Amino acid sequence: MTTTLNADPAELAKFSELAHRWWDLDSEFRPLHQINPLRLDWIDKLSPISGLRALDVGCGGGILADSMARKGAHVVGIDLSTKALKVAQLHALEAQTPNVAYREVSAEALAAEAPGAFDVVTCMEMLEHVPDPASVVQACATLVKPDEWMFFSTINRSAKAFLYAIVDAEYLLKMLPQGTHEYAKMIRPSELAAYCRRAGLDLQQTRGLEYNPLTQRYSLSADTGVNYMFAAQRPA
């Protein structure tokens, strides 16, 4: 596990600059709001979260953390963007979201502090933004209790992902700001699977997320060519 802070200052600055727009449904974060019901339902079916202690790694403005808390989980969201965390905290206060707290701490630091403290760990749309994604996966594996679940989502490093996630989403459809994603930082499913194996995790399920520009809707799919999610368990 890395000993230096596993963060890219440019990435932190980029998302901090947009922090005030996290809960604007017509902003650059609209895609996250659109996919959130799909990923929340998928998580809840594999690991019913009501009453569980959940950790959301790279929580940003709290979109997933807030929705898990509203499903009955006791949630801690962590991030390294001070501005994003302030937005998440303010939203929780205004929306009166129960049982959610936010901390400015890295996954690695929290893993050293509280190993095996959580019933479920999520790390969504974050791995492609850090210098050492394998270190984050290892930290997640340390943080979750034995026999419990972790959920990851990221973007494939493929020609299709370059076309859809960068050219289309950032330049043609302008769904995201230019420079949101860097092709070299995207992660192939085989690479994420290798990170999971090295962390001692058992991969249980893979799902793709597909976007239909005509209906402007996302759906779960077997196609992992662009956005995809992994469900893994820490062995008992």
PLM segments and residue spans:
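N-terminal, positively charged/glycine-rich alpha-helical extensions of SAM-dependent methyltransferases
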Residues: M1-D24
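Conserved SAM/SAH-binding beta-strand->alpha-helix loop
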Residues: S81-K83
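Conserved class I S-adenosyl-L-methionine
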Residues: W149-L173
